[in-house]
Structures are given as C-alpha cells and as structure tokens.
C-alpha cells in the first residue's frame, strides 16, 4: 500500500493525468445535463461573487465578457454551492466521489464541505456547457493552493453529442495531448492543477445558440478561495503556440 501511495503521488507530481472510467453512471450525467438545462430556462443569466450568502446562479459568458476572466473563455456555466438547498440533488453523488479525490490530495475527505465564503475556501460545483463554434477555454494552469488536482467529469461524448475539439492537456514542447477519443460519459480526469490544459471549440461549422443544449458539457468540482479573501489565489493563462484551440473569432 505504501509503495502504491508513493507511486501515485510521484506520478501526479510528475504531470501524469488519469482518466477514471465510469466514475459516474452515464444515466446520472445525462439526466443532470437535462435537469440543469431545464432548471435554468426560466431564470435570468446573473453573476454573484463568492461572498457570504451567494445564491446558486447561472451565467452566459459570451466572447466579449469572457475576456474579463482570469483566462479567456466562452461558456454557459451553472454554479451550485453546498450552503444552498441543492435544488437538483447533486451534492450527494458528487461528494461521494469528491471525498476520495480530496483524500488523494492530502486533505480530509470532507475538507471545506461545511465552509461558507467567510471561512476563506469553499467548494463549488459548476456544470458547464460549451456551445458550438464559440465555446472554448484558453490554455491555462488551475489554482493549486487549496486543490492540488484537476477534477473534471464528462457529461457528453465527442462523435455523438459534438464533433471535433474538446478537452486537451499540454505536454512539454507545447504539444497538445488528445484524450477526447478515450472519454466516455461518466468518466473523470485527474491531474496536477498546474498541468496546462484547455478546451478547444467543437462543431466549428454549427451556428451557436445559448438556448439550446447542444455542444460539449462537463462537470467541474473545485475548492476555491472565496471573494471574502483579499489577493485570492487564482489560476493563470499561458501563452502557447498551439493551432486550432481558439475560436475563429480570435
């Protein structure tokens, strides 16, 4: 057991990424995708900082507003916090998996679960839709201070729900590592937070709309420094010469 622990920690620190197959059921992910889309149809796009009492909300981040973020992005994000009433019953099944990953990161398995923004670090679940053609996330490094690993769940599949593009990791020499072909709905990926990664546009020939549920969906689970913290720790973009990972509009 000790040798396995040393081996996996060394591997993750060394920049290896792991695709954990079937971590969530396919039905759970597809159902969550549909429920999130329906739930937010009647609610306006809003924005709230991670401050005490912040509600759950969803926000359309178009190409223009996405330039104001730590790294450039275009997406439709749905944010859920554990201190609210969990309207879609997502925290139970997510925490079942997240606790294992937190333990792997050297945290208590229930670290941050009871925290609210005044405590400094908070858990946040984000369901993300990248619309066709314009949806993307530029190459970047995630914040690593409070969560050592990327922890992403996949809610759609390339070749079925969308064509081309999607998630990529970056190897030395600015070489993109293509893993989308190996991803199935319900899988999760873990890698050290400072491994460069991003999301390339999908369905480049398709006209995007914010009302539809097409495109690429994924589930993000992250422990963030809240906006109650001054000089909060954030991720940062990286300028890499990789072709085909930005929208044509860029």
Describe the predicted segments one by one.
Residues 11-19, 69-84, 163-166:
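Glycine-rich, often proline-containing surface loops adjacent to acidic residues and nearby aromatics
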Residues 23, 83, 128-131, 154, ...:
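Structured loops at beta-to-helix junctions and adjacent beta-edge loops in soluble globular domains
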Residues 24, 61-124:
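Signature of the catalytic double-stranded beta-helix
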Residues 15-17, 122-125, 136, 148-152, ...:
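Extracellular structured ligand-interaction cores
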Residues 158-250:
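Catalytic core of Fe(II)/2-oxoglutarate
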Residues 128-132, 144-161, 219-225:
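Short, conserved beta-strand element in jelly-roll/cupin
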Residues 1-67:
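N-terminal auxiliary "cap/dimerization" subdomain that precedes the catalytic jelly-roll/cupin core
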Residues 137-143:
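Histidine-centered catalytic micro-motifs
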């Amino acid at each position: 057991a000790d040798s396995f622990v040393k081996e996996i920690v060394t591997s993750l620190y060394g920049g290896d990424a792991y695709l954990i197959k079937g971590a969530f059921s396919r039905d759970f992910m597809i159902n969550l995708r549909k429920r999130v889309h329906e739930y937010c149809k009647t609610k306006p796009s809003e924005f709230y900082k991670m401050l005490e009492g912040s509600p759950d909300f969803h926000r359309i981040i178009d190409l223009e507003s996405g330039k104001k973020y730590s790294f450039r992005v275009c997406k439709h994000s749905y944010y859920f916090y554990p201190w609210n009433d969990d309207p879609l019953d997502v925290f139970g099944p997510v925490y079942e998996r997240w606790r294992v990953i937190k333990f792997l990161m050297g945290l208590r398995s229930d670290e941050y679960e009871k925290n609210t923004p005044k405590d400094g670090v908070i858990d946040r679940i984000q369901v993300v839709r990248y619309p066709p053609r314009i949806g993307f996330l530029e190459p970047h490094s995630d914040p690593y201070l409070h969560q050592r690993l990327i922890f992403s769940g996949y809610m759609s599949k390339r070749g079925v729900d969308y064509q081309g593009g999607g998630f990529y990791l970056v190897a030395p020499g600015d070489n993109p590592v293509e893993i989308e072909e190996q991803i199935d709905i319900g899988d999760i990926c873990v890698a050290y937070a400072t491994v460069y990664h991003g999301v390339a546009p999908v369905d480049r020939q398709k006209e995007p709309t914010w009302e539809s549920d097409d495109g690429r969906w994924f589930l993000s689970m992250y422990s963030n420094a809240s906006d109650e913290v001054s000089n909060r720790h954030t991720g940062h973009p990286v300028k890499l010469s990789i072709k085909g990972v930005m929208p044509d509009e860029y």
